[in-house]
UniProtKB/Swiss-Prot annotation:
It comes from Flavobacterium psychrophilum (strain ATCC 49511 / DSM 21280 / CIP 103535 / JIP02/86). ATP binds at residues 50, 57-59, 106, 116. SUPFAM superfamilies: Glutathione synthetase ATP-binding domain-like, Succinyl-CoA synthetase domains. GO terms for molecular function: ATP binding; magnesium ion binding; succinate-CoA ligase (ADP-forming) activity; succinate-CoA ligase (GDP-forming) activity. This is Succinate--CoA ligase [ADP-forming] subunit beta.
Amino acid sequence: MNIHEYQGKEILASYGVRIQRGIVANNPVEAVAAAKQLTTETGTSWYVVKAQVHAGGRGKGGGVKLAKNLQQVEEISEQIIGMQLITPQTSAEGKKVHKVLIAEDVYYPGESETSEFYISVLLNRSTGRNMIVYSTEGGMDIEEVAAHTPHLIHNEEIDPSVGLQAFQARRIAFNLGLSGNAFKEMVKFIDSLYNAYIGSDASMFEINPVLKTSDDKIMAVDAKVNIDDNALYRQPKYADMRDIREENPIEVEAKEVGLNYVDLDGTVGCMVNGAGLAMATMDLIKYAGFEPANFLDVGGTADAKRVETAFRIILKDENVKAILINIFGGIVRCDRVAQGVVDAYKNMGDAIKVPIIVRLQGTNAEIAKELIDNSGMPILSAVQFQEAADQVKAALSK
């Protein structure tokens, strides 16, 4: 579950991480009031207006701007709220901005130069261990750093049996080139950041940039946070942070009815039981020269009602030109699934206007094929994996 920057900063602050202070606003009037409050509390006279969407790269998309007075706060907020923000991490349509964060200006002059770093904590799925990824090249262009100078990005793996050790935090601070008070501040920052990551059951905490201020303080200027969905049952206070408006509406609807659905950009809808078979089916579609429109795992109870619900979910995507149903009958019987497909097709009537290709293997697969072939419905059946792909290709080539 992704959350907004301001929510991520709230979590960080609760674990003792120094953050760039800010107040969220839903409209320009609230934005001006937030700026006035910040001036009272922090003394700042310049402000940063930051679009709150679940995507990185907001600065490049025009979603982060500096305001030097209250009038500019109002004007910039009016520009950003309601805009379709397009960044390297959004679709071509972008994301609509519903709120902004009015933050204090922390790039003030002082005895030393400011520096920006990149630090994230996440799970290394290859080793099964948490790790801290860090770089001296923090800021908007971290993607460019990763692509062209990957040697500037380092990582520190954490042994789960002992957790983050003090020497590891010191090593990171040393590798970032810090000394004196800034070194001590960074060690404390890393320790608190890791505690926030563990304590909130997060799957990622990305801070970009981490700022060394001109008076050698270390603070989080941004926060991109993902909370593990599977841990929300024990993190109810974070579950309330979900912003449905930021999520794909089809995915939200699918989740409400218990379907595991992920929207993609292709034209071939997929209805499969089991995540592994679903991914293999998507690969097959790509090998056939097409792109999958979704990942959809119907699970082990593919009755008529569930199949019909899955059909309706898939067809909400206007880009879908064909649907491939690929079911392996282990516990679930193939004939039951086939009857569900036929019944769903009858119930939906003219709602289904795209070719349907069904491949059923496993328990009662022969009976299932007969059911489909004798149904009188314009449903194509296949036995082999490649045969199903060929039928998809033939259907879309007409």
